[in-house]
Amino acid sequence: MKPFTQHTGLVCPLDRVNVDTDQIIPKQFLKSIKRTGFGPNLFDEWRYLDAGQPGQDNSKRPINSDFVLNFPRYRGASVLLARDNFGCGSSREHAAWALDEYGFRTVIAPSFADIFFNNSFKNGLLPLVLNKVEVDALFAQCQVTEGYTLTVDLAAQQVITLDGTTYAFQIDTFRKHCLLNGLDDIGLTLQHAEAIRAFEATHRIRQPWLFAPLR
């Protein structure tokens, strides 16, 4: 997992509440057994005017020019600004995969659905909570300033805007540690590889009957 320390990026404002996981990555794209290939179909039903299917050539599909992610000014955005209850709906880790693969490093919103919130941390995507007044201020600045960027400093737990305004945010200490060091569940386990090997070696000696062949 790629570490998240400090990120400066273009902001894209998605001004909709209750964005659910089926809108983030529609169900027909969940057939893949891989965790890659979802970025091109992020917000598929909003980005395109037709119904998308897995393996389809998106370059030939009609674009919804009214959807914010298709605006030229937000091309290459890596910070998604959202509204309340982002990531609600059914549980699918694919939603975090799609956002990450598209290029978003963080989603800023007043609140997140619990399962999406947890899945994001496990995949290196920072779900960053600011209060509604602060999010409203960011929306206002983003919509009037083309090329609006901001910086997220995870170590300092601050969002830093173009004019130097800073917004503090809270994050669980363990989750912060994992993001700063790029540690997913496997990475955390591998940190204890020597202890695991030592346990397995002595465990086999202490309880050999557990390893005897079945008869």
Curated annotation (Swiss-Prot):
Organism: Xylella fastidiosa (strain Temecula1 / ATCC 700964)
Name of the top EC class for this enzyme: lyase
Protein's name according to its UniProt entry: 3-isopropylmalate dehydratase small subunit
Family matches, as NCBIfam families: leuD, PRK01641.1
InterPro entries xrefs: 3-IsopropMal_deHydase_ssu, Aconitase/3IPM_dehydase_swvl, AconitaseA/IPMdHydase_ssu_swvl, IPMI_Swivel, LeuD
Phylogenetic lineage: Bacteria, Pseudomonadati, Pseudomonadota, Gammaproteobacteria, Lysobacterales
Involved pathway(s): Amino-acid biosynthesis; L-leucine biosynthesis; L-leucine from 3-methyl-2-oxobutanoate: step 2/4
Chain's role: Catalyzes the isomerization between 2-isopropylmalate and 3-isopropylmalate, via the formation of 2-isopropylmaleate.
Enzyme nomenclature, EC number: 4.2.1.33
